[in-house]
Every structure is written in C-alpha cells, then in structure tokens.
Amino acid sequence: MVPSIGLSGGLALFWKEGIKMEVNKSGLSHIDAFVRGDGNFGQWHFIGFYGNPDMAKRAESWELLKSLCGPNSLPWLIIGDFNEIICVSEKYGGAVRPIRQMARFKEAIDFCGLREVGFVGPQYTWLYQKHDGFQIRERLDRALATQEWLTLFPSAKLFHKSSSVSDHSPLLLSFLHKPKKKKKSSSDSNPCD
C-alpha cells in the first residue's frame, strides 16, 4: 500500500488467495510487482499507477511510466488513476483539455506498446460536482496492457464500479469475464481511435 497525501493519491493492491504477488518496488505514485499465477498463466508484470495531479508535473509521470516499461520480457499490465485523458470524448463538461497535454500521455502509452483492456460500466471514472449541479466527468482511471498480456488473458475486463464515498470509480479486474446478453455497457475498443 502507498499512503495518500492529504486527499490525493494513495494506492492499494488486493489480490485473490492462491495468487502469488511479489512487490518489486514502490514509490509515491506506483507499485511495481510480479505475479505468479497458477497453472497455464506463468509469471507476468503488474504496475499500479497514480499520475501526478499537478499538470505542470505530469511529464514526470510519463517519464516514470516509460522507465517502468523498460527492458522487460514478461507480459505486463498497468492499472491506475493516470489523471489524464487520451482524447476529448473522454471528458464531459468544463474547459477543453489542451490537445498537446493528451498527446503526451498517448505518446507514453505508445512508447510502452500498451493497449486498452476493455471495460464494463460507465465511460467516466471520475466526477467533480458542485452544489449547483455543475459536473465534470472524465475517464482518468484505466487498465493498459501489452499484447502479450492480452493474449494470455483474452477474456479480461476492467469493471468500473460505483462509489458513494469517492469521486473515482473503484476498479475491479476480472480475468474470466462473461458478458451479459441483455445490456451492452462494455468497451472493447478505444473511442479515441
């Protein structure tokens, strides 16, 4: 666990019994771990990530992301609050996000060879709401993985859960997602493409 600073940040990592998790290193904005699954899944790399909430320091987050993806031959997954969106469709309300700011995040993702893990639930994972009803909604939280990881876990989905105590949606990763036939609320593709 990485503690919060005031009301911002903080990371917690929970896993199911039977999964072997070895934390390699951690800092204020990340948890870097190796996962040893059972049976056919072997070993893979996991990173819990928190992007700097200060826009002036966001470039430091992208440099950290690039350094974490460095020379690693294992399949890997990164989940977290990146405090950034990839494209304008990931934001509702408020001022328009500068394109260059989003592009820097996308460049770091591309540098690491990461792809979106499909999600189930509301598109936006963060809500800012004033007493007068004004809202800003953004998709700040996500799961990204290498193609090798996605091949290893083809049914994996990230669930955006509802919360009454946080402005962020809790995230739950399921490796064996079976879609419901009644309601379509999942995303297997990136709306920014």
Per-segment meaning from a language model:
Residues M1-D193:
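A shared catalytic/ligand-binding motif for oxyanion handling
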